[in-house]
Amino acid sequence: MNAEPSIQSKLLDLAAVDAELTRIEHRRKVLPEEQEVQRLEAERTARKDASVKVEILIDDLDRDIRKLEGEIDAVRKREDRDRGMLTSGSVGAKQLSELQHELTSLERRRKVLEDDEIDVMERREAAAADHAHAGANLDQAEADLVDAERRRDDAVADLNVAQQRCDSDRSALSGGFPADLLAVYEKQRATGGIGAALLQARRCGACRIELDRGEISRIAKTAPDVVVRCPECNAILVRTKHSGL
């Protein structure tokens, strides 16, 4: 295949644009701002779970408090009933003794229930404080995530601008090559990653391998308009006065 040396040299410009496109694509895949968003999303989920866990605990404690209040109220009503019977003077000695014994038992039971209620209410108060703390943590995580998403979107927008510029440059450059030369370049780029590279100081700019004397001698004898390729990676080699020929 033949192409004017000036045309071959422009392949380096195309390769430079393609290298930048490759870097842009790689940066998209490993974008630090995206990784930070993902980390903060996980953090927000964890803090949301922690907040929900405390909410469930508070609901359970509220249910326990209502149950204890109901039991305490029932005991007090029985106490009031028994005291009413005691003060009525209408009960006999045996029933009087039974009522007094029952009142003692009811009072003991009420105190146990009231102590339990105090314990649950204290736990409920602590849980409410935990919930407020968890809510503050969640609010902070959501604010951090919003900020990280903004930075990520800005970074992606910058990459989009850079890619659009490279796409435009590539389109302009591609139109200046013979179809057969461009086809060889594109095929090599698709398989080897780098379509064309500078031969400099006897070293291929694509695979970075130094060519042996025999290969260098062969290339040196090849007409300037003949397209030569690296024997190692098959990239198109662009020759200049710095090629070491």
Q: Where are the model-predicted features located?
A:
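Short cysteine-rich clusters marking metal-coordination/redox-active sites
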Residues: 204, 230-233
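Coiled-coil termination/hinge junctions
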Residues: 145-206
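Amphipathic alpha-helical coiled-coil segments
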Residues: 53-65, 106-127, 173-174
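Short linker/helix segments within small regulatory modules
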Residues: 219-227
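Short Cys/His-rich local motifs and their 1-3 flanking residues in nucleic-acid-associated proteins
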Residues: 209, 232-235
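Short, charge-rich amphipathic alpha-helices with coiled-coil/heptad character
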Residues: 1-5, 19-59, 85, 132-148
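Long amphipathic alpha-helical coiled-coil segments
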Residues: 67-79, 113-138, 184
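Short, non-ligating residues that shape and space the ligands of small metal-coordination modules
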Residues: 213-214, 239-240
